[in-house]
């Protein structure tokens, strides 16, 4: 197994991982505060960086440790999920870990028959596309599903990160609903969008269910120590702005409210105040440059922008008032380093309009990406002061 040092079998102690010395910061100070400062709109001493899908399929140590476990088994095994979450932190010295999980884990915990097939993705035994099926699951979520295993994994992971922030993880209601209604991946999301317009009552129940599942999933992570959370809306780009605002945004806001303990079930939360300390909420939507202002309005803290939207244009749309994250084109990871470096520097320059910037990809790490290229990006980011 290769550690962050690149030496076979070596693991750098987590407490020693930090922004590079060129930033002039002590070992613990940036790790504990830098990326969190950026999430809250302040530029720290050097550029924070982490990668979507940094844990998992692209790392040889992941493939070694997962063994014969299925992806969902790995997500729900505290020791294994923790180890996989930590692997990219050790290897790259990124400034945050993100919980190793999958957006369909809440469905699994709700008793839904679901599996993640290699080369295909999440597949349900039966689509959740009828009022009866939706109502059955809504009744379960009304009483709250047991997310104890997620809380255990989160606490365990936080305890060994030694101050490095842990980012929680969940799918946005629309993307989760697409899997529920379609029964698996879809390029067009035709069944989901048809239900949205042709059977609004059932659609609203599906979205209510998805919002509850993802909101409770995030709440379990936040209350167990996650210092920030990111919501992934992989399929939002398939929607017009009107469809997003009218039929999706209210449920994404509901997810955020539930995650932050604003659920309408107590006198305190009815006032709009969180039942527990609010953490930064990051949001990523693919191919959704036309939705940025609508996404901002659901209450997100940091806009994670996909690689198709230049960050200076994104910042202008957001009145230069919102922290940005992104947005390296994953395809550039396969270019020569000097080409990739120019691309990264251009992104950083374009992001200078925003109050703060966290360097990331504009989509997930490809499974065959070069670990060396990702390590070079981290070194470059940490050299910027």
UniProtKB/Swiss-Prot annotation:
GO cellular component, one term: cytosol
Principal location class: cytoplasm
Pfam families from the UniProt entry: URO-D (PF01208)
Xref: PROSITE patterns: UROD_1, UROD_2
Binding annotation for substrate: 53-57, 102, 179, 234, 363
A Gene Ontology biological process term: protoporphyrinogen IX biosynthetic process
GO molecular function: uroporphyrinogen decarboxylase activity
Metabolic or biological pathway: Porphyrin-containing compound metabolism; protoporphyrin-IX biosynthesis; coproporphyrinogen-III from 5-aminolevulinate: step 4/4
Domain of life: Bacteria
Keyword Lyase: yes
Covalent S-S links between cysteines: none
Catalytic reaction(s) noted: uroporphyrinogen III + 4 H(+) = coproporphyrinogen III + 4 CO2
Keywords recorded for this protein, A-Z: Cytoplasm, Decarboxylase, Lyase, Porphyrin biosynthesis
Compartments (UniProt record): Cytoplasm
E.C. number: 4.1.1.37
Site (Transition state stabilizer): 102
Assembly behavior: Homodimer.
Record-stated family: Belongs to the uroporphyrinogen decarboxylase family.
Function in brief: Catalyzes the decarboxylation of four acetate groups of uroporphyrinogen-III to yield coproporphyrinogen-III.
Record-given protein name: Uroporphyrinogen decarboxylase
Organism listed in the record: Tropheryma whipplei (strain Twist)
Gene from which this protein is expressed: hemE
């Amino acid at each position: 197994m290769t550690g962050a040092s690149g030496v076979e079998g070596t693991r750098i102690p987590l407490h020693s991982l930090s922004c590079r010395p060129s930033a002039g910061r002590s070992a613990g100070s940036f790790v504990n505060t830098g990326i969190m400062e950026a999430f809250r709109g302040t530029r720290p001493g050097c550029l924070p960086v982490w990668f979507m899908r940094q844990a998992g399929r692209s790392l040889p140590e992941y493939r070694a440790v997962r063994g014969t476990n299925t992806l969902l088994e790995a997500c729900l095994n505290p020791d294994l999920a923790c180890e996989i979450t930590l692997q990219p932190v050790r290897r790259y010295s990124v400034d945050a870990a993100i919980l190793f999980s999958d957006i369909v884990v809440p469905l699994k915990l709700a008793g839904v028959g679901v599996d993640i097939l290699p080369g295909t993705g999440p597949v349900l035994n039966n689509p959740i596309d009828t009022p009866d099926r939706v109502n059955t699951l809504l009744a379960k979520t009304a009483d709250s599903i047991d997310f104890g295993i997620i809380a255990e994994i989160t606490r365990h992971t936080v305890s060994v990160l030694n101050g490095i922030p842990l980012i929680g993880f969940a799918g946005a209601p629309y993307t989760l609903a697409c899997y529920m209604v379609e029964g698996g991946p879809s390029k067009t999301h035709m069944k989901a969008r048809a239900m949205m317009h042709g059977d609004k009552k059932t659609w609203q129940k599906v979205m209510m269910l998805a919002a509850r599942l993802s909101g409770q999933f995030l709440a379990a992570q936040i209350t167990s120590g996650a210092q920030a959370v990111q919501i992934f809306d992989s399929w939002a780009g398939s929607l017009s702005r009107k469809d997003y605002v009218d039929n999706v945004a209210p449920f994404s806001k509901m997810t955020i409210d539930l995650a932050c303990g604003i659920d309408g079930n107590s006198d305190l939360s009815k006032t709009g105040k969180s039942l527990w300390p609010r953490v930064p909420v990051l949001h990523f939507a693919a191919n959704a440059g036309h939705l940025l202002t609508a996404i901002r309005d659901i209450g997100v803290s940091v806009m994670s922008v996909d690689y198709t939207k230049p960050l200076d244009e994104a910042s202008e749309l957001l009145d230069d008032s919102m922290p940005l994250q992104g947005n390296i084109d994953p395809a550039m990871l396969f270019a020569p380093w000097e080409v990739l470096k120019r691309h990264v520097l251009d992104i950083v320059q374009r992001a200078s309009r925003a109050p703060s910037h966290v360097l990331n990809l504009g989509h997930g790490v490809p499974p065959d990406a070069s670990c060396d290229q990702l390590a070079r990006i981290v070194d470059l980011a940490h050299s910027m002061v």
